[in-house]
From Swiss-Prot:
InterPro entries: BolA, BolA-like_sf, BolA/IbaG_stress_morph_reg. Residues 114-137 are annotated as: Disordered. Belongs to the BolA/IbaG family. Its main location: mitochondrion. GO terms for cellular component: iron-sulfur cluster assembly complex; mitochondrion. It is found in: Mitochondrion. Acts as a mitochondrial iron-sulfur (Fe-S) cluster assembly factor that facilitates (Fe-S) cluster insertion into a subset of mitochondrial proteins. Probably acts together with the monothiol glutaredoxin GLRX5. May protect cells against oxidative stress. Keywords: Mitochondrion, Phosphoprotein. Interacts with GLRX5. The modification Phosphoserine is found at residue 81. The keyword Phosphoprotein applies. PANTHER family: BOLA TRANSCRIPTION REGULATOR (PTHR46229), BOLA-LIKE PROTEIN 1 (PTHR46229:SF2). This is BolA-like protein 1.
Length: 137
């Protein structure tokens, strides 16, 4: 079941579902986010692809594209361990991970696993950045 907060960014891709949140929730999609989406679509032909730019919740300049969360549902994951699934995603995004992307949280499921639990993970608040803003002396 798709949560209501994601439906405004719903995009159809040839019978697949792509949930897009835009750059840090702004609705705009930046070049890194667009490249990530394109590469994952090409490499994994996902049935569901959710990509969130979570950079806005971190100590980075506004408009940054450094922290992402991705949920990928693909039949390519059948018979693969979670580590093997993550390696497929990392291989597809090698250029981004070597450059602008600092953090990538991954949910990689088969269609059957998604059918059993379509709950999307959420990220905890950022604890990095300027410690003075976190109440530490």
């Amino acid at each position: 079941m798709l949560s209501g907060r994601l439906v405004p960014g719903l995009v159809s891709m040839a019978g697949r579902v792509c949930l897009c949140q835009g750059s840090a929730g702004s609705g705009a999609v930046g070049p890194v986010e667009a490249a990530i989406r394109t590469k994952l679509e090409q490499a994994l032909s996902p049935e569901v692809l959710e990509l969130r730019n979570e950079s806005g919740g971190h100590a980075v300049p506004p408009g940054s594209e450094t922290h992402f969360r991705v949920a990928v549902v693909s039949s390519r994951f059948e018979g693969l361990s979670p580590l093997q699934r993550h390696r497929l995603i990392h291989a597809a995004l090698a250029e981004e991970l070597a450059g602008p992307v600092h953090a990538l949280a991954i949910q990689a499921r088969t269609p059957a696993q998604w059918g059993e639990n379509s709950q999307l993970d959420t990220s905890p608040p950022c604890l990095g950045g300027n410690k003075k803003t976190l109440g530490t002396p």
